């Protein structure tokens, strides 16, 4: 590993220790908390939209978020390790089959919607829970008759 890559890895680890970003990918709807400075005041502004791309690696990694503001499409590119990003919230997971969703730029209205990804782990956990409840109900009358 060369010296530059080693320094980048150390910086990434240091920044990641301060703030944890959720694991998100293109197609996910995210809310990015951005620190905005206006004159002497600083505030945190939320920018919510669909992540349409992730690119780069190491310290140079970025993600692009697209939203529709007053009927106009707005895209913003955020560096993952930027000090201006306070945090990222995952609003919902999207089901897509592409890494770059640039085709969304040409779609309008309902055609630009992304279906929500169903989480199989939650579903299987609910099924297991229901089966356990059913077993408890079946076993309970047998103990009551003894």
UniProtKB/Swiss-Prot annotation:
The keyword Ribonucleoprotein applies. SUPFAM superfamilies: Translation proteins SH3-like domain. Pfam families: Ribosomal_L19. One of its GO terms (cellular component) is cytosolic large ribosomal subunit. It comes from the Bacteria. GO terms for molecular function: structural constituent of ribosome. Coiled coil: none annotated. This protein is located at the 30S-50S ribosomal subunit interface and may play a role in the structure and function of the aminoacyl-tRNA binding site. Belongs to the bacterial ribosomal protein bL19 family. This is Large ribosomal subunit protein bL19. It comes from Bartonella henselae (strain ATCC 49882 / DSM 28221 / CCUG 30454 / Houston 1).
């Amino acid at each position: 590993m060369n010296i530059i890559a080693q320094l980048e890895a150390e910086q990434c680890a240091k920044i990641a220790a301060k703030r944890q970003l959720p694991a998100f990918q293109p197609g996910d709807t995210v809310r990015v908390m951005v620190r905005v400075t206006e004159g002497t005041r600083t505030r945190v502004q939320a920018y919510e939209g669909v992540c349409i791309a992730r690119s780069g690696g190491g310290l140079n990694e970025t993600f692009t978020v697209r939203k529709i503001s007053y009927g106009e499409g707005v895209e913003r590119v955020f560096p993952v390790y930027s000090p201006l990003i306070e945090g990222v919230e995952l609003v919902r997971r999207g089901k897509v089959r592409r890494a770059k969703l640039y085709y969304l730029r040409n779609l309008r209205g309902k055609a630009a919607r992304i279906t929500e990804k169903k989480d199989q782990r939650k579903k299987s956990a609910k099924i297991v829970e229901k089966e356990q409840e059913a077993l408890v109900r079946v076993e309970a009358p047998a103990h009551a008759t003894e």
